[in-house]
Each structure stands twice: as C-alpha cells, then as structure tokens.
Amino acid sequence: MSGTEKKLGFLASGYGLSPKEKDYPVLGFAVDSRKVAKGFVFGAFPGAKVNGEDFIEKAIAAGAVAIVARPEVKIEGAVHLVAENPRLAFAEMAARFYAPFPPVMAAVTGTNGKTSVAELCRQLWTITGHKAASIGTLGVITAKNSYSLGMTTPDVVTFLSCCSDLARADISHVIFEASSHGLDQYRSDGAKVIAGAFTSFSRDHLDYHGTMERYLAAKLRLFDERIAPDGTAVIWADDPAATTVIAHVQKRGLKLIDIGEKAEAIRLVNREADSQGQMITLSIKGESYKIRLPLIGGYQLSNALVAAGLVLATGGDIKQTMAALTLLKPVRGRLERATQSQNGAEVYVDYAHTPDGLRAAIEALRPHTEGLLWVVFGAGGDRDKGKRPEMGKIAANLADHVIVTDDNPRGEDAATIRKEVLVGAPLAEEIGGRKEAIFSAIKRAEKGDIVLIAGKGHEQGQIIGRGETMRVLPFDDVTVAKEAVL
C-alpha cells in the first residue's frame, strides 16, 4: 500500500485535536476492519447492507488510532473524528495521506459507455505522447500492463492508493469510471478532477437507487461537486438527459464541451458506416474534419468522440487528437469481434446488460447484417427486475432470432429470471445453459448472419448463488464462441 507516515494533525486539521493527538503517527487508512493495522484511520460508514459502525471495536482492537464516524457514534480507545458526512471527510483525509496524484485526472459517468470512453481516452492520450492510465471495469490499464481492482469503482482507499502508485510510476494522465454507486458513496473523492464526461442515462441500478431521479442525482454529483471549479464538462448532447446535465454544468460555471449532432463545440455532421468502421465528418471551431474511425456502431462513435472531448478538455491539440482517432483499437468486450462461424457468420460479444445498452448494440450491428441478426442474452439475478421484460421486448423488436439464456443468476432461480425476460419476448427461444445457447446460435447462423452475445462482455465468470454460497464459475463469452467453431 502506498503512502508514508504522516501525523494525524496534518491529516485531520480543523478537528479540535489535542497537541498529543495531533502528534499521533498515521500509517494507513481502511474501510474494512479486517484490513486495519496499528496506526490506521478507520472509516465507519452506515451502509445499505453493512454498517461500518458495527466494526469500530474490532478496528480499535486491531490498532486503529482514529475513527471517522457520525457525531452520535460512541467511541472509546481511539480518537473520534466527528463528521456529519463521514465518507467525504474520510476521503479528504485519505487523499492528504496518499498524495501526490497524477496532475491530470478526468472522470466519466453515464449508464452506458463509461468503460469504452475510459479506455479510448487512455489510448488517445497515449497516442498523443502522454503516459496515461484508465481505472474502471476492466481494471487498471496502462500502455505496459493491466491488473484488476475487482469492481468498476473500488473503495476510496484502493482508489487513492492506486492513483498514488500511478503517480510514482510517472503516469501523468488518468481517467476513471465514476459509477453512480461510487459517486453516491464518495469512493473516488479526494483527488482533484479537472475534466468530467457524461455519456448517457437510462434505466439501471434501481435495485440500489430506488428511483430514476435518485439515480440521475448520483451521476450529477460529478458535475455538481467533483469537477474542480475551473474544470471542464464534456457532454454527449444527443442523449435526452443532456439538457439537465448541461443546466447543472452552467449553474456551476464549468467550461463546457458538448458533442453530437445537436452540439455546438464538436458537431457530428455526417456518418457513413461500413464493415470495418465508419467515416465521420466533424465541425469544430468552424473547421471541418473528415475522420476514418476504425470502430463499428453508433454508440462506439459517441464514446470515441466523448473520449476525444476529454483529451481536448485536458489540453490536447485538436488536429493531433483528430488524427489519433484513426488509430483507436476496439475495447475488450465492447462490440468485440469474437470469431467467424464455419458457415461464415460473424460473432460479436458485448457487455450490454441494460435495455438501452442492448438496443444500442443491436442497432450498431444491424447495418452490417446482410442476413439474420441473432441475439443471445439473459438478465442478472439480484438486480433490477423491472428491466427484464424491457430487454426482452427490445431484443424481440430489433433482432431476427432471439435466444434467452442465463447471465449471472446469483441468488435467484435462473428459470424464473428467464421467464421474466420472456414476458417481453414471448416468441423467443429459451436455452438455459449459456454455453449451449451460444453453441446453438453459432452452429445455426448462416453466411451473412451476425450473432450478438450480450451481457457479459469482458467478464470471466458466471455468478451462481449469493452470500456464503456464492460461486463464480469460469466463463468467457469470447472463449466459448471460439470453441463453438472448432
């Protein structure tokens, strides 16, 4: 873990500490009591599933020197750092401990597109000569290596420690995915963000947020609070929620780069798709740019342009950035071409796991489909049940042949999940085993057909059960697709 010893008085200035308390050495931070060691500061946060306040005694027994917690919490045996918002206070203290961070830090939020924007932005920075990294669903990626952090937005200690490590490795530019969960729980607070992007907004995570209004409010926190006052917001203007986001950006006084057919800063004038990518025409500051983008699909076009907007927002040169767009590589699990069947059908894998994401993936592949468009997908267990029939309806309306299968059933009955999806797609085929479903589609698809395997993308496992009974069975859609053509 990065970070060197610092005094509690330096990390927690303004908390009314005694001279003796100010001199306490701090050796680390933790939000998990099992990771606390002597000299650590422990963050005790009330949570949706687990209450960190229940683990204060365990943290003190493990050597915690201070506890960040709400005023009403009783603490004996350690310094009580009182905070009405303990998550934010903890993040600010941890940031002082783990600093310095890379000088250029950007973030991206949105229901869909975060991972693609983060990876494409990292690529653009790298192509234009910067040492860059991305943090998110695919893990931590640099030009030289990559490693997993376990979730889209890791806990704040892992995040800040990671940023500190990247700075020590001479990484100057970092982009991270700011998920609604992460923003709501202050998991990526502390480090200065000079640019932030918005991709899209549609139904997802209602099992956590409860309503679409609270879900959007979580995402808006990036623009209301996280981007530095002198920072820049990059907005995909063609999304229905863009008007709301832009209003928040303007109220805050941030600089704005809007992008899309409806935009002023970077306007998409024309787009012509072919089997290898798309030719696009952009209008920027009165200049016209014709660019050959080597990515397929309208949604990857929008993601690439948002990534380019972030590069410009962080000091990039327009002509260099436009030239770099022609050199982009596809993102793992995002409309990734997996294989070609023995009959000549093209097979793609995509992470689409929301109604809007599934629609975008199918619509992206339709112009390239000469024959039938097959879709193999399912819905995750222990997640928003309301989106299941919606996804079924979208697949049924937009694809030619739909196979409903399993996708991380977790603690729910897999057959029940499939049944709820089939409400929206009553004529769809049902094949429970994901491998069997993929094999069936690929074996039957003909030359000119396209098979889309949706839901998992880059994921390497099928999650069965919950809690102590949870198992992650090895499963990779791309690998299984390749096995189907052997």
Swiss-Prot record:
Binding of meso-2,6-diaminopimelate, residues: 383, 407-410, 455, 459
Protein's cellular compartments: Cytoplasm
GO terms of molecular function: ATP binding; magnesium ion binding; UDP-N-acetylmuramoylalanyl-D-glutamate-2,6-diaminopimelate ligase activity
Primary enzyme class: ligase
Record PTM text: Carboxylation is probably crucial for Mg(2+) binding and, consequently, for the gamma-phosphate positioning of ATP.
Pathway: Cell wall biogenesis; peptidoglycan biosynthesis
Entry binding sites for UDP-N-acetyl-alpha-D-muramoyl-L-alanyl-D-glutamate: 33, 152-153, 179, 185, 187
Cofactors: Mg(2+)
Keywords: ATP-binding, Cell cycle, Cell division, Cell shape, Cell wall biogenesis/degradation, Cytoplasm, Ligase, Magnesium, Nucleotide-binding, Peptidoglycan synthesis
Short sequence motif named Meso-diaminopimelate recognition motif, residue ranges: 407-410
Keyword Cell membrane recorded: no
Alphabetical list of HAMAP family matching this protein: MurE (MF_00208)
Protein role: Catalyzes the addition of meso-diaminopimelic acid to the nucleotide precursor UDP-N-acetylmuramoyl-L-alanyl-D-glutamate (UMAG) in the biosynthesis of bacterial cell-wall peptidoglycan.
NCBIfam families assigned: murE, PRK00139.1-2, PRK00139.1-4
Xref: PANTHER family: MUR LIGASE FAMILY MEMBER, UDP-N-ACETYLMURAMOYL-L-ALANYL-D-GLUTAMATE--2,6-DIAMINOPIMELATE LIGASE MURE HOMOLOG, CHLOROPLASTIC
Descriptive protein name: UDP-N-acetylmuramoyl-L-alanyl-D-glutamate--2,6-diaminopimelate ligase
Source taxonomy: Bacteria, Pseudomonadati, Pseudomonadota, Alphaproteobacteria, Sphingomonadales
